[in-house]
Regions:
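A generic short-segment signal for beta-strand/edge and adjacent turn/coil regions
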Residues: 16-17, 38, 63, 93, ...
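Active-site neighborhood of glycoside hydrolase catalytic domains
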Residues: 166-251
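Residue-level signal for threonine
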Residues: 77, 220, 263-267
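N-terminal structural segment of carbohydrate-active enzymes
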Residues: 1-190, 194-195, 202
Length: 310
């Protein structure tokens, strides 16, 4: 772990709802700069800024359209550089959220990958070899591009999975992690990291860090190898840069390139607990099965809540 991380107190910022300086109703990087003294006054000396790269924002910025551009709603790259400088002058480190597992379907890499003719980005994403092929257990989309193939998704339809390879090969269209196309994906992500670190960023909180490689082994052998490779680069070129993993497995992540693990227990859908009736919506008590907190038959309906608290 980096020495500065041992004393770090992080303040997480969701940019769009933090502080708006231009009156458009959306928070921005200048708003973060304006509140640095406030943040420091709370005793915090590090920031984790949720996704702020260019995006259509179909998934809160976790669908990146351009890794090297700040989203227009938040400002400019010049604003990012100004934020790094202002924060450092106050002894505050700044980490950006990095989403290496997928891009937006509007990313230029993906647009090129969709073309039927072979090009540099044809295998930057995971494609089957036929528009009628399934995803071998992974979610997929077909029939929407000129290319004869279906593409693998990580989460939503708008988030095609970047190709880091497969740990276990089941289909002829699946590539091993040492395939040149998969190696190129790793190098492209290193290039993104260098871009922001050169500007003054202090590191990254890495989204879905444990699941880059598909069909990986139980101990994430191939994904771990990628992160050790990236850490080797950072140790040489940016020795003070921090990596924080969304992994939920510190015994694994800390041995494979990460300084800290973003460790959270995964919970259920909070909205469903409040509003939707389904088995187990409230808890395991037999009297509560199929009753959500704010539904009329729960004894804690919304009317009672409104009458007593508003």
């Amino acid at each position: 772990m980096k020495q500065w991380l041992k004393d770090a107190v992080f303040y997480e910022i969701y940019p769009q709802s933090f502080y708006d300086t231009n009156g458009d109703g959306i928070g921005d990087l200048q708003g973060i700069i304006a509140k640095l003294d406030y943040i420091k006054g709370l005793g915090c000396n590090a920031l984790w800024i949720n996704p702020c790269f260019d995006s259509p924002f179909k998934d809160a910025g976790y669908d990146v359209r351009d890794y090297k551009k700040i989203a227009q709603r938040y400002g400019t790259n010049e604003d990012a550089a100004a934020l790094f400088k202002a924060a450092h002058e106050k002894g505050i480190r700044v980490l950006f959220d990095l989403v290496p597992g997928h891009t937006s379907e509007e990313h230029e890499w993906f647009k090129a990958s969709c073309r039927p003719e072979k090009n540099e980005y044809s295998d930057r994403f995971i494609w089957t070899d036929s528009c009628f092929a399934s995803g071998d257990g992974m979610p997929f989309i077909g029939g929407e591009t000129p290319r004869n193939g279906t593409y693998i998704l990580n989460f939503f339809k708008c988030q095609p999975a970047l190709n880091y390879g497969y740990g276990k090969i089941n289909q002829k269209w699946q590539k091993p992690t040492d395939d040149p196309a998969c190696v190129a994906t790793v190098e492209a992500m290193k290039d993104v990291m260098r871009f922001w670190l050169d500007m003054g960023c202090d590191g990254f909180r890495v989204d879905m860090a444990s699941s880059l490689v598909k069909n990986d082994t139980k101990n994430k052998k191939y994904t771990c190898k990628i992160w050790r490779n990236i850490r080797d680069m950072l140790d040489v070129e940016y020795p003070e840069a921090a990596l924080i993993a969304e992994w939920n497995g510190p015994r694994m992540s800390l041995k494979n390139g990460f300084d800290m693990d973003f460790y959270l227990e995964w919970g259920g859908n909070g909205y469903s607990w409040l509003m939707r009736n389904y088995d187990g919506a409230m808890d395991s008590n037999p009297h509560n099965i199929g009753k959500a907190y704010f539904c009329k038959n729960s004894g804690t309906g919304i009317d009672k809540f409104l009458d007593e608290y508003l």
